[in-house]
Design a protein with these regions (language model features):
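Short acidic DE-rich linear segments
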Residues: 2-5, 83-87
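N-terminal acidic leader/helix
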Residues: 2-39
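Intrinsic disorder/low-complexity segments
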Residues: 6-7, 12, 44-47, 59, ...
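Long amphipathic alpha-helices with heptad-repeat character
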Residues: 16, 68, 72-75, 79
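A structural signal for well-ordered alpha-helices, especially hydrophobic packing surfaces
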Residues: 23, 27, 46-50, 79, ...
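Acidic, low-complexity, intrinsically disordered interaction modules
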Residues: 31-72
Length: 87
């Protein structure tokens, strides 16, 4: 597993599981309140997750996973990056 910095594999796998599941629900949800709840859950998780992993996923972008207007794009990017880190 090539994850760059010394990020524990379980942190990558756990984050992938959460983000992948939330992305699938968010992508197909037609409920604005459900989508808002998902944004809140993911942002809260991101604030407490492994800081090195967050930095790698954010790739220097301020407000990564925290802004409503870019949330879907950010979450897709995070899931894609996590998938590549696990292979």
């Amino acid at each position: 597993m090539d994850n760059g910095a010394a990020i524990p594999p379980d942190a990558i796998e756990w984050t992938y599981c959460i983000f992948h599941q939330k992305l699938r629900v968010y992508k197909f949800s037609t409920s604005p309140s459900q989508r808002d709840e998902i944004e809140h859950v993911v942002a809260s998780y991101a604030m407490d997750m492994n800081p090195d992993l967050y930095k790698k996923l954010a790739d220097g972008r301020e407000g990564f996973l925290m802004e409503h207007t870019r949330f879907f794009e950010d979450l897709e990017h995070a899931v894609d990056t996590l998938e590549s880190m696990m292979s």
